Amino acid sequence: MSDAIQRVGVVGAGQMGSGIAEVSARAGVEVTVFEPAEALITAGRNRIVKSLERAVSAGKVTERERDRALGLLTFTTDLNDLSDRQLVIEAVVEDEAVKSEIFAELDRVVTDPDAVLASNTSSIPIMKVAAATKQPQRVLGLHFFNPVPVLPLVELVRTLVTDEAAAARTEEFASTVLGKQVVRCSDRSGFVVNALLVPYLLSAIRMVEAGFATVEDVDKAVVAGLSHPMGPLRLSDLVGLDTLKLIADKMFEEFKEPHYGPPPLLLRMVEAGQLGKKSGRGFYTY
């Protein structure tokens, strides 16, 4: 078994990938981030720089620590540049076919036999992407939460064939190096958090759809009555209604249970491009 993880690769520099890269670099780890296009690399780098600047302004990171983190980040459009990584975390679009193709390529490219290949998927069973590799025993789920620099939880998902040494090594990295709280769970769609969260969000949408209560009153009831920091409909907007639908679709496909099924109102809003905060309009206007 190789030494402690010091070289990390991240596939995808979107909201999640850039956050994972940032927290890894802030922890003193050498990080290589892959995106297939220079424009995506520029966007990802800018996202990380802005996040670090906010952290400096908030007094959470010194300017020296910011500069050190940025110095540990490398960006590439060549997947082969991840060949020497000890841990590669995939954080691309929530599409099984796309993820499977990436894992097949990573399995070919990453040469260290002890290297771990991890997916940040929030809903796809890990075995589905592990099956695309010739070494599924080194594949596991490592699901971070948005925003990655702020939320402390990581779900670590073992499949039926994941090597325990790989899981233990990854857990040590996430907890000791990144300072995350790790929850282990078995390989089923939604894992722990989304299996609880998604039915709750969909139930709130159904309540509004049925005219039982307004968007504002549903959120007010949860915030004022349950001390949640945010109501379910505003949270749905933050997650992204298209993302919520994708996760719900995957969970309904796996479990065939009605409470995982996306309600018609959610479907219509996604079709109309009302995706929540990122599009400027969802249950609220931004």
From Swiss-Prot:
It is an enzyme of class 1 (oxidoreductase). It comes from Mycobacterium tuberculosis (strain ATCC 25618 / H37Rv). Pathway: Lipid metabolism; butanoate metabolism. Its EC number is 1.1.1.157. It catalyses: 3-hydroxybutanoyl-CoA + NAD(+) = acetoacetyl-CoA + NADH + H(+); (3S)-3-hydroxybutanoyl-CoA + NADP(+) = acetoacetyl-CoA + NADPH + H(+). The record marks H143 as: Important for catalytic activity. NCBIfam families: PRK07819.1. Induction: Up-regulated upon acid shock and SDS stress. Keywords: Fatty acid metabolism, Lipid metabolism, NADP, Oxidoreductase. Optimum temperature is 37 degrees Celsius. This is 3-hydroxybutyryl-CoA dehydrogenase. One of its GO terms (biological process) is fatty acid beta-oxidation. The gene is fadB2.
